[in-house]
């Protein structure tokens, strides 16, 4: 098996996914798919390829007809699987062979037709069974619902994803076939349930699939709305709203258009026809019909029972009788209000073709034929001329006969028609299908007054102007008390800048309306000027240990003298300034300062530890807008708070004037080296304000 598959684009095991088919037919399907793959490299006659595909489809339908009441569903799914293989061969080929391989080029649209058919028929089975009083086995309903879910997801997605999840669908179909045979052998399926499956799951009309292939053979393209059972080319996604919409997964509220729009597919029951209790009252008529028969059910009048037309399967081609009967039952009916019933024309009957039926010829049938004539045998249908007055363009209804139902001939009520019976309602029917079905039309009378101004004007958003301040002007501004009238930096919303003691920074903050580019250039120049005016450090040797070069950090006395000397403005009314360290470099942060100094500098016994505490205290005061610098060191941790977290009082909402550190949650092991005091306090404050 593996040697036979070598060098081929399809494995032999792939065709084993077909359900209910013989090994001989699976081998023929494998050769057919290989032929389609080779058609992209070797030129074949498109008509010959179409004949091969048609022969394969007919054999699939005939073998599926032996699978019981669900033969129509198994036929659609097997054809869906076949055209998925055709589309896969098209996607593997980079070059477009166009009209030389019609079955592969049209496979995308045919897959959509089959997918929408399976979705519609599966939902139709649940609705019709509930409305007709027919019970289906729960296990079969569960498998049908899983297939319904897969097909619904395909109809809601893009066209290119129609082939996805092919293998799970075929596995579900195989399980459904085995379960159905088990129930049927055990006699657990009633006659009504089997008749219901035959009426709902009707096999696909074969010319519906072969028509686009014949069109492509002639070098043309089928219209886009042909590849849908609703006749719609656009894929819409109507959203349903309700209380149960959001109970399932996202997107489950979307409804495919095949479940909303009117159905224009031959062989499918109308969407509004859900109560078939009168038809299922005599299921023997449905069960005794030939295999793969099409059932056309109509209801000429609300007070009359349903009428059923049985059209046997015709594999030779298009069946005019089926098309005419289906169109007669699918179109809208206009009731004739005349008192005297109109008789159909019998002497001036004419022959009609499929083209004439499509152009709007009105058919008047007197009986339902037992066997439809094959194509080319000269079968004729009595019709009326299109030039006949509208009063004579009526069609007789197929009404069940009340007498004459014998057990030997159970379908006698289908073969009787009495158009002249007074109890028969004559209806006029239009057989031309509408090109565009209008679901809703909204009209309004023109108003004499001019329409109001409906221009949507969005409100203008006012964003505050944020003026970043340099770090050189940030730390000295902390020493200015609140009583002087100056604002503290940070935490204020508005378009105005934050005043500070530095004249350059104050000028930068005042120009709040300056353009951004000009503002940035002024900030850079301000930073350069402040970098040049750094106070000169003392040249006398200090007693600091090696590695304690901390930039511009000096003693508190030097800081106080520098601040007093450089102060501007009315200094007489200002209180004495606090002793603060000089500002840090512009491009230097606290963590960079720690990395540069090294761990040996931040020791508890270091001479610069008071200066470090003052620096950290000023930073914390500026970050959290405190009135006074918070104390960092205390003789005992027990004096700052309660022993247990339960005793910690909740914040009252007011401003804190003095911060209290939080005790560490875990003690440091005795065998490990104690962390530095300042860094330990910094981590404590960070954890405190983070919580």
Swiss-Prot record:
Principal location: host cell
GO MF term list: DNA binding; transferase activity
Compartments, record wording: Host nucleus
Entry GO terms, CC: host cell nucleus
GO BP: bidirectional double-stranded viral DNA replication; DNA-templated viral transcription; regulation of DNA-templated transcription
Keyword Transcription: yes
E.C. designation(s): 2.3.2.27
Protein name: Replication and transcription activator
